[in-house]
Amino acid sequence: MCAVKATLVVRHRITYGEELFSEVVVWVVPQPIAGCTHAYKYRLALVAHGECVLRYDNEAGKGDHRHAGSGEGKYRFSTLDILFADFE
């Protein structure tokens, strides 16, 4: 039996300055991540001075969620385009 692997959709890092960058990584997965109903595994992060100040991700078990500063809350995923717009 052959395992189906995830397919990379995008991996992009933008440096805005010496201490500021954003990183976007999205995969299409063969089955939804635990806690999600869609076929994506993603991480979108904004990092300033070595600290993540904003992140959208869907780690297994937690499902779709958003980190802003020290806070964390649920995120309602609908499409990649809306996710990207929300991250902007």
Where are these regions (language model features)?
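The feature represents the first ordered module of a protein
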Residues: 2-65
